[in-house]
Swiss-Prot record:
Gene3D superfamilies from the UniProt entry: YVTN repeat-like/Quinoprotein amine dehydrogenase
Subunit structure: The APC/C is composed of at least 11 subunits that stay tightly associated throughout the cell cycle.
Functional note: Component of the anaphase promoting complex/cyclosome (APC/C), a cell cycle-regulated E3 ubiquitin-protein ligase complex that controls progression through mitosis and the G1 phase of the cell cycle.
Annotated SMART domains: WD40
Regions of compositional bias (Polar residues) in chain numbering: 88-99
Protein name (Swiss-Prot/TrEMBL): Cell division cycle 20.4, cofactor of APC complex
Keyword Protein biosynthesis in annotation: no
UniProt similarity note: Belongs to the WD repeat CDC20/Fizzy family.
Positions annotated as WD repeat: 124-161, 166-205, 209-246, 250-289, 298-340, 342-383, 386-425
Region feature Disordered, mapped onto this chain: 88-108
Length: 444
């Protein structure tokens, strides 16, 4: 290297090795844990570049300087010869209600197989009948041909309640009182028998309300509502001898579904005329031509599936038969249809969960399945298969967890579909009318 080159390549003095003295026998060793190599790399490679579009006003420079102070404190040196500053005290976010996210509820396990299968020989495959009911005393009643059987879910024992004479039968409908002690039995000859299931004795026969078979029954305390093939709906006060107190006229074909609301203020009926009616007892005895509160004609097939919502008193779910296959939701205050969901098959029965916002539907051809829906999104949570024929009947246990389903394949299946019961489960209703039939002197 010539002398000219040496003149232009002077070595900075602070890079030359320092002479050691007797008083300074060691070097300063930087604390590597306090180094900021990322910032150093940026400063060496990008720090000197300038953006040609950068605003160079005084306020902009002041802002950038202040931002650098806030974001990059004590970064004037690349090598740090001191320890890191102490970390900030940890903040307990549990003291602030706005910081705590709600705990995520674990996804509930839904068994895909039935817990138990019972034979039900002679079960009639008729869409217009109602042959299964689970009482509040935890006894399941099922009608097989001319005979009504009782299955005690607590003990597992089965007993025969009654076999109807051939000239009166077969049995076309059954329904428990709210206390689970008495059972109404509708017959093909238009009569309704009332049975005390504690003593296994018949206490009364209701006649004169219908001209043909009684396929639907629904209790509201001492009022037994009956629906017949003649299209009539009759309210019977079982405490008095002349039991018929109101008659509703509106259906032109057989009444195949009846349900009282939880409050007992409204009653829903569905028929083979594809019509759903909402009835109010105050209108039944009026002289007006129209007795119903609302009339829904949107279904295109028979409506048997009816279910009042347990958490919203005015909400009613209905399901259409073959050719319709829709579940519809109604506001029974206004008469508005809130939603309509296509299921793809005949809707035979509907049940609400007592503890969750869920709805269970049973179906016919092609899959003959039970479908669990999340309300109000109506997204499918599970499909339960096992039946080989349309699932006409469903009944819910008193604690709300177990569902019994009966189909034309003559099988009765038990499903743990609704999970564990709520912490405050409802106790079996006490009998409001312990002397319900005390004023009746004759059984027939």
């Amino acid at each position: 290297m010539d002398s000219g080159m040496r003149a232009t390549c002077t070595v900075p003095e602070h890079f030359l090795p320092r002479k050691l003295s007797k008083q300074n026998l060691d070097r300063f060793i930087p604390n590597r844990s306090a180094k900021d190599f990322d910032f150093a790399n940026y400063a060496l490679t990008q720090g000197s570049k300038r953006n040609l579009d950068e605003v160079t006003s005084a306020s902009r420079k002041a802002y950038m300087t202040q931002l650098a102070v806030v974001m990059n404190q004590n970064r004037t040196r690349i090598l740090a010869f001191r320890n890191k500053p102490k970390s900030l005290l940890s903040t307990n976010h549990s003291d602030s209600p706005h910081q705590n996210p709600k705990p995520v509820k674990p996804r509930r396990y839904i068994p895909q197989n039935s817990e138990r299968v019972l034979d039900a020989p002679g079960l009639r495959d008729d869409f217009s009948l109602n042959l299964l009911d689970w009482g509040s005393a935890n006894v399941l009643a099922i009608a097989l041909g001319d005979t009504v059987y009782l299955w005690d879910a607590s003990s597992g024992s089965t007993s025969e309640l009654v076999t109807i004479d051939e000239d009166k039968g077969p049995v076309t409908s059954i329904n428990w009182t709210q206390d689970g002690l008495d059972l109404a039995v509708g017959l093909d000859n238009s009569e309704v028998q009332l049975w005390d299931c504690v003593s296994n004795r018949q206490v009364r026969t209701l006649r004169g309300g219908h001209e043909s078979r009684v396929g639907s029954l629904a209790w509201d305390n001492h009022i037994l509502t009956t629906g017949g093939m003649d299209g009539k709906i009759v309210n019977n006060d079982v405490r008095i001898r002349s039991s018929i107190v109101e008659t509703y006229l509106g259906h032109t074909e057989e009444v195949c579904g009846l349900k009282w609301s939880e409050s007992g203020n409204k009653q829903a009926s569905g028929g083979n005329d594809n019509v759903v009616h909402i009835w109010d007892r105050s209108l039944a005895s009026s002289k007006q031509t129209r007795q119903w509160l609302h009339r829904f004609e949107e279904h295109t097939a028979a409506v048997r599936a009816l279910a009042w919502c347990p958490f919203q008193a005015s909400l009613l779910a209905t399901g259409g038969g073959v050719g319709d296959g829709k579940i519809k939701f109604w506001n029974t205050h206004t008469g508005a249809c809130l939603n309509s969901v296509e299921t793809g098959s005949q809707v035979c029965s509907l049940l609400w969960s007592q503890s969750e916002r869920e709805l269970l539907s049973s179906h016919g051809f092609t899959q003959n399945q039970l479908t669990l829906w999340k309300y109000p999104s109506m997204s499918k949570m599970a499909e339960l298969n096992g039946h080989t024929s349309r699932v006409l009947f469903m009944a819910q246990s008193p604690n709300g967890c177990t569902v019994a389903s009966a189909a034309g394949d003559e099988n009765l299946r038990l499903w743990n579909v609704f999970g564990e019961p709520p912490k405050t489960t409802k106790k079996a209703a006490s009998k409001k009318y312990p002397e319900l039939f005390s004023h009746v002197n004759s059984l027939r």
